[in-house]
């Protein structure tokens, strides 16, 4: 045995002198990893005896450790409770490759204590078993401690069992012999959960030491592991456990079922102060160890249990016991299954054989000894021949048995696979049927909707035809009446004339002689002086005159009334009551057919009512039908003509006495500086829950006088083209005084929101075309008709026909709009979306009304015109953001619920009591909005630009570290949305009330606090559009940036402890986050493209250098580059390359159980490496997939159901999978709707899906698929703009960095959780994230980069 040979010091061990194992031992299979090498099950070639063989590379660095391990094993393994060392061999390798050392040790076939626990019901051992195993461990430790050796890694995995239930300690890789003088160590080695507090302290404090009593703490933890199935704190991260072990009280058994003796034993082992912890010999005398029942009985029970476990597994010849190392593992109990190979007898003989091999080359000193040995050899050979014959027979039987088992297993596997295939096929068939059924239902639903839509349109057309016929009949009837009346009047005049003539004749005949003049009465005479016949004639004329054409002054007075709504208010609702009640119209003066009385509580005039002759009956019926059908009309022409010749529309209708609807000219209120808007005031209630949908204005239509020939005679028309006001201009579109009818009623009221659209919709073509800034004026059909009509035509039929045609068209659009309910989305981040508060007339009972201004940010389009960022003109697709009519307060939030997960902000004004001039600045509550365009003012101080600025507390920085130096500096990012009130449900009418109530929570407090300011602002037309936000700092997630500007572009970064390693175009730096933000240069003139810190392995993985090699840097070497406190480290090379890989594009480190995989994307291949612990301590090749059809740009690795490894990679065409076992490659998602190449952004393996489902992000979309290419969710994640960088963060969210905003979305649903707007467009790149902090970098035009970090802690996310 090893003990027979004289103990040699480390220097005396000559590794090169050891024999080659070829022909003596062969390796069977890998069973685990030791601290410095891999452990194999091996077999002695001649005898078939099994042995555990640890294989290690002999490198210069680790030669001392290897010699130390050999020395330890040779000296101290000769004990019944320690796995015996048999011998060592050297396997020579060709030059350039390290030689391999084979350490041959006793093989323990029953596995480890951890395996025993796993295979026991309830994962707990019986108390007498625990006592037996603890006693055996103590015996082994006692032997080591007597020889001044600390094991330093006692745990369940390092305590093995033989098939006879003998207990053996293994893994001396970390054992250390105590110096005879000092007797203490201060190195940090061991497994975190079993580690003693004093061992952990030695890492934190270099002066701390420990001794052999640390093994007794580990024994106590192992006893708890045997009792409870796992060590304390095992559910925590190892680093967290290391932090807590010295700080927490000593652990105890949770259950009260254990005996007092056992609990006392645990307490004795787990004493935190190691100086007070009992010694090994004292613990041997503890009642729990000393007073044990029949040991033989316990061993029999254990042996039976081991045998039963083997039978249950069907004697699978799979992984044997995993000889685990202690390289700061993150999990404590991942080992292989126990061996199923029977441990053959004759171990002592085998030991003698090994001894003979070791002593064969020794000189025989004495002839007598030689003769004795020869005689002994002859006897042994005779004995050996007998044994060999027996063993050969047993081995053949065993081989036959194994063949039978393998055959049986193979059949079972095939059967199982076949069943799985059947199940999968059945499941796929079921899913296909389900999909077909769903598709059929969708198609039926779609057809049904189409039919309903067509039916509705037919009904509307029929109603329109009926109304048109009714109007024509009424008109003809009136004409006939007028004609008859005229004929009657002519007849009467003729009779009067005849009567007068006959009277004259009579008088002449009566007085033929007298030539007296006839009596002529003067017009100025009093009625009493007129003769009776004249009075009679006058009376008749007066009666007739009541039905004669109107007097000019009457017309003039009516028309100049400012409160007559212009045509642009058609289809708007100016009252707050539900619009389903038919309009109550005053009787029409039959001789003034062009004017219709307007009642504010009912709906405003329709397009055809506002100008033409409208009989009362036909009008009422038509209006009622219109309102019942729909409350909303799209705004197809809202901004389609920036230079249309129409005067500015009034921004609100003055409150006035409801008993006198039509004011006289002298009642016109004094004019105030006009703030014109791009929409009619009647739109203000377009989103109230009462009507449930937006009512769009008919912008650009002529006011009432423009289409009425009578009015044209009465008033001059001034048609000055209004120029389009750009967002940077300061000209105010004030109205000339020669337009009293259009300006008369305008007050600085609140604005209705212009619903900005993001999508070009098929059913609203006029809305979908962007308007160029210098487009010539185009006059709409109605306008051209109204403006060019020279005088009153003989018949109104043509005018009525035209208006009815326009009405029919709008009604069709209305119905399409109502059916489709399109989302109103913010088209451009630069468009101001100020909340608008309606301030039109309230109901007479003073009841407040609620409406919501919503902004949809989930779909910010990629259709922004090319000149938008650089020029002053701010365009939206399908809708010009700043019209000739100022949109400073017109761009309010509007819209309905989004079908696509669109974020809504609701506002209720129910808390507010509005006065006649309420909300003159257009702000009700303030949300944090984009701050992209500077506020401009007209000479009179009137705000005229399209985008107001909203500054918030979160934008005003209090310290120099937040976005610059001074507190007045504006933030680079503006939190845009409050996620507490966002709604992303599908569009259902019955959900609108819920949204309104959610809105109340958001703005009620804000509205009250802003009320005083707004009341003051309402009195004047110059408004402060920079109100101070009253929300505290903590309400919004913070974004901060470090002052340091990097001269070259930041490409990647990784957290190392609390500090940040930053990789740039020309070097690697460390940003000291714990101190003053100082930056240390670590490596110069080398490009770093990607990096990850693996602190447990002491490495930094990078893609770096001109050739994009995969380099692994040692963290200890990098640390020494800053501290320069270890000359030994400085001498060594600080990095190694992984393989000979060049041209790496992307990699991903994937941790699965205790294995760390490195998946690497190359030019047309994917390589998989796996981390090999000491003695290798490097990534070693695992699998390679070359000559791929698609070039991988992005890679990830998933483990399906804990069994099948699959590589997922993204390319320019889509996303693909490689089955690691078979090497087969197939597509899982190809976006066919995108022509040309795509940019893959991210692959997110979804949690709780057994590695089967993922979210793949590309371009501005994300799709949910599984590893077989099936779409798993009907949802498509839609970014608001094309992101430059996308990353999954561990709060189960995904973030996208665009040039205009940062979006945060839920990984599970794709719903928007928040948006951060940038003050200006900038390119951002994700760097890394940990816990609640996300780091990213900006790149400016000058090439300087800065590091930002965003804190998304839970509390602020809840309040945000």
From Swiss-Prot:
Root EC class: transferase
Catalysed reaction equations from the record: L-seryl-[protein] + ATP = O-phospho-L-seryl-[protein] + ADP + H(+); L-threonyl-[protein] + ATP = O-phospho-L-threonyl-[protein] + ADP + H(+)
GO molecular function terms attached to this record: ATP binding; protein kinase activity; protein serine kinase activity; protein serine/threonine kinase activity
Extent of Low complexity compositional bias: 720-755
Keyword Nucleotide-binding recorded: yes
Region (Disordered): 284-347, 398-440, 539-589, 601-801, 814-878, 908-927, 933-998
Pfam families: CNH (PF00780), Pkinase (PF00069)
Composition skew (Basic and acidic residues), residue ranges: 288-307, 652-669, 775-789, 814-827, 908-917
Positions bound to ATP: 31-39, 54
Disease: Intellectual developmental disorder, autosomal recessive 54: A disorder characterized by significantly below average general intellectual functioning associated with impairments in adaptive behavior and manifested during the developmental period. MRT54 patients manifest intellectual disability, delayed speech and hyperactivity.
UniProt subunit comment: Interacts (via the CNH domain) with RAP2A (GTP-bound form preferentially); the interaction is direct and required for the activation of TNIK by RAP2A. Interacts with NEDD4; recruits RAP2A to NEDD4. Interacts with TRAF2 and NCK. Interacts with TCF7L2/TCF4 and CTNNB1; the interaction is direct. Interacts with TANC1.
The protein's name in its UniProt record: TRAF2 and NCK-interacting protein kinase
Species of origin: Homo sapiens
């Amino acid at each position: 045995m090893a003990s027979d040979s004289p103990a040699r010091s480390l220097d005396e061990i000559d590794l090169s002198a050891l024999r080659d194992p070829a022909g003596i031992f062969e390796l069977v299979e890998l069973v685990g990893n030791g601290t410095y090498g891999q452990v194999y099950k091996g077999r002695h070639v001649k005898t078939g005896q099994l042995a555990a063989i640890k294989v290690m590379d002999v490198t210069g660095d680790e030669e001392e450790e290897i010699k130390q391990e050999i020395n330890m094993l040779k000296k101290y393994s000769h004990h019944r409770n320690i796995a015996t060392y048999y011998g060592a061999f050297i396997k020579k390798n060709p030059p350039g490759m390290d030689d391999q050392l084979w350490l041959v040790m006793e093989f323990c076939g029953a596995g480890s204590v951890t395996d025993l626990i796993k295979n026991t019901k309830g994962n707990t051992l019986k108390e007498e078993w625990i006592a037996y195993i603890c006693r055996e461990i103590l015996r082994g430790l006692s032997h080591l401690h007597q020889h001044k050796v600390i094991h330093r890694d006692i745990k369940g995995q390092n305590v093995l069992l033989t098939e006879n239930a003998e207990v053996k300690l293994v893994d001396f890789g970390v054992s250390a012999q105590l110096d005879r003088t000092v007797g203490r160590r201060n190195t940090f080695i061991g497994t975190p959960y079993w580690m003693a507090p004093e061992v952990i302290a030695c890492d934190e404090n270099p002066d701390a030491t420990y001794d052999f009593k640390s093994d007794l703490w580990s024994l106590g933890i192992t006893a708890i592991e045997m009792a409870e199935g796992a060590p304390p704190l095992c559910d925590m991260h190892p680093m967290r456990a290391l932090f807590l072990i010295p700080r927490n009280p000593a652990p105890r058994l949770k259950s009260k079922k254990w005996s007092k003796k056992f609990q006392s034993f645990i307490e004795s082992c787990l004493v935190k102060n190691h100086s007070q912890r009992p010694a090994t010999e004292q613990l041997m005398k503890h009642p729990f160890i000393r007073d044990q029942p029949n040991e033989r009985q316990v061993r029999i029970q254990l042996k039976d249990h081991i045998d039963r476990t083997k039978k249950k597994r069907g004697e699978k010849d799979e992984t044997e016991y995993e000889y685990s190392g202690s390289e700061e593992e993150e999990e404590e109990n991942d080992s292989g299954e126990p061996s199923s190979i029977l441990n053959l007898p004759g171990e002592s003989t085998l030991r003698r054989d090994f001894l003979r091999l070791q002593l064969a080359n020794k000189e025989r000193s004495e002839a007598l000894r030689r003769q004795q040995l020869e005689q002994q050899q002859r006897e042994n050979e005779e004995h050996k021949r007998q044994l060999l014959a027996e063993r050969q027979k047993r081995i053949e039987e065993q081989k036959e048995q194994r063949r039978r088992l393998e055959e049986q297993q193979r059949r079972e596997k095939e059967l199982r696979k076949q069943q799985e295939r059947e199940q999968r096929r059945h499941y796929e068939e079921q899913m296909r049927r389900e999909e077909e059924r769903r598709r059929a239902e969708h198609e039926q639903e779609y057809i049904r909707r189409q039919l309903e839509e067509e039916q509705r349109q037919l009904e509307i057309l029929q109603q329109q035809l009926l109304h048109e016929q009714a109007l024509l009949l009424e008109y003809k009837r009136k004409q006939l009446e007028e004609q008859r009346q005229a004929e009657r009047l002519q007849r009467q005049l003729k009779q009067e004339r005849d009567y007068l003539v006959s009277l004259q004749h009579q008088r002449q005949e009566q007085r033929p002689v007298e030539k007296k003049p006839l009596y002529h009465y003067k017009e100025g005479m009093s009625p009493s002086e007129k003769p009776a016949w004249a009075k009679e004639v006058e009376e008749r004329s007066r009666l007739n005159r009541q039905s004669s054409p109107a007097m000019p002054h009457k017309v003039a007075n009516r028309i100049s009334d400012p409160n007559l709504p212009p045509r642009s208010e058609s289809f708007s609702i100016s009252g707050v009551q539900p619009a389903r009640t038919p309009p109550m119209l005053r009787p029409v003066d039959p001789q003034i057919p062009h004017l219709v009385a307007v009642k504010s509580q009912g709906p405003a005039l329709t397009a055809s009512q506002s100008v033409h002759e409208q009989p009362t009956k036909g009008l009422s019926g038509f209006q009622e039908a219109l309102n019942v059908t729909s409350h909303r009309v799209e705004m197809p022409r809202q901004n389609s003509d920036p230079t249309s010749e129409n005067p500015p529309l009034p921004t609100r209708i003055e409150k006035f006495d409801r008993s006198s609807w039509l004011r006289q000219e002298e009642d016109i209120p004094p004019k105030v500086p006009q703030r014109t808007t791009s929409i009619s005031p009647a739109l203000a209630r377009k989103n109230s829950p009462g009507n449930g949908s937006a009512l769009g204005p008919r912008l650009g239509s002529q006011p009432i006088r423009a289409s009425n020939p009578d009015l044209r005679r009465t008033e001059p028309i001034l048609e000055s083209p209004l120029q389009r006001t750009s967002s940077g201009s300061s000209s105010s579109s004030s109205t000339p005084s020669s337009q009293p009818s259009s300006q008369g009623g305008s007050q600085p009221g609140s604005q209705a929101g212009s619903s900005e659209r993001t999508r070009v919709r098929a059913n609203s073509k006029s809305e979908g075309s962007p308007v160029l800034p210098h487009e010539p004026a185009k006059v709409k059909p109605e306008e051209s008709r109204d403006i060019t009509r020279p005088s009153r035509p003989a018949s109104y039929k043509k005018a009525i026909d035209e208006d009815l045609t326009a009405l029919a068209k709008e009604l069709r659009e209305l119905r399409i709009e109502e059916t489709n309910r399109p989302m109103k989305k913010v088209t451009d981040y630069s468009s101001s979306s100020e909340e608008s508060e309606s301030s039109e007339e309230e109901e007479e009972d003073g009841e407040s009304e609620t409406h919501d201004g919503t902004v949809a940010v989930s779909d910010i389009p990629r259709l922004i015109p090319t000149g938008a960022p650089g020029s002053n003109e701010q365009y939206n697709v399908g809708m010009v953001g700043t019209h000739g009519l100022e949109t400073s307060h017109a761009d309010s939030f509007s819209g309905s619920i989004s079908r696509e997960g669109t974020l809504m902000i609701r506002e209720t004004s129910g808390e507010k009591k509005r006065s006649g001039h309420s909300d003159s600045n257009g702000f009700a509550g303030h949300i944090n909005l984009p701050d992209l365009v500077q506020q401009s003012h007209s000479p009179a101080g009137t705000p005229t630009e399209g985008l107001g600025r909203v500054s918030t507390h979160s934008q005003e920085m209090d310290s120099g570290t937040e976005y610059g130096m001074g507190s007045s500096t504006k933030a680079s990012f503006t939190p845009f949305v409050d996620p507490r009130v966002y709604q992303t449900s599908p569009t259902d009418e019955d959900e609108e009330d819920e949204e309104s109530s959610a809105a109340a929570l958001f703005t009620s407090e804000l509205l009250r606090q802003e009320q005083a300011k707004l009341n003051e602002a309402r009195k004047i037309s110059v408004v402060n559009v920079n109100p101070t936000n009253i929300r505290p700092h903590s309400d919004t997630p913070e974004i901060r940036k470090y002052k340091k500007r990097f001269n070259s572009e930041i490409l990647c970064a990784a957290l190392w402890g609390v500090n940040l390693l930053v990789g740039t175009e020309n070097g690697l730096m460390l940003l000291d986050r714990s101190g003053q933000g100082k930056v240390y240069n670590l490596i110069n003139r080398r490009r770093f493209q990607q990096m990850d810190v693996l602190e447990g392995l002491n490495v930094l993985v990078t893609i770096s250098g001109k050739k994009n090699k995969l380099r692994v840097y040692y963290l200890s070497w990098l640390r020494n580059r800053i501290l320069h406190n270890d000359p030994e480290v400085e001498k060594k090379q600080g990095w190694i390359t992984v393989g000979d890989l060049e041209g790496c594009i992307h990699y991903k480190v994937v941790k699965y159980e205790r294995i760390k995989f490195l998946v690497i994307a190359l030019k047309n291949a994917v390589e998989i490496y796996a981390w090999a612990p000491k003695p290798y301590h490097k990534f070693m090749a695992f699998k390679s997939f070359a000559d791929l059809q698609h070039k991988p740009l992005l890679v990830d690795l998933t483990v399906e159901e804990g069994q099948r490894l699959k590589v997922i990679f993204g390319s320019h065409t889509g996303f693909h999978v490689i089955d690691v076992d078979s090497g087969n490659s197939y597509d899982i998602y190809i976006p066919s709707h995108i022509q040309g190449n795509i940019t893959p952004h991210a692959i997110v393996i979804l949690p709780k899906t057994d590695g089967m489902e993922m979210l793949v992000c590309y371009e501005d979309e994300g799709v949910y698929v599984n590893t077989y290419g099936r779409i798993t969710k009907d949802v498509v994640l839609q970014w608001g703009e094309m992101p430059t960088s996308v990353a999954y963060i561990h709060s189960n969210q995904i973030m996208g960095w665009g040039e205009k905003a940062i979006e945060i979305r839920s990984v599970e649903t794709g719903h928007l959780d928040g948006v951060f707007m940038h003050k200006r467009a900038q390119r951002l790149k994700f760097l890394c994230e940990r816990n609640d902090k996300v780091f990213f970098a900006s790149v400016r035009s000058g090439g300087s980069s800065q590091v930002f970090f965003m804190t998304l802690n839970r509390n602020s996310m809840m309040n945000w």
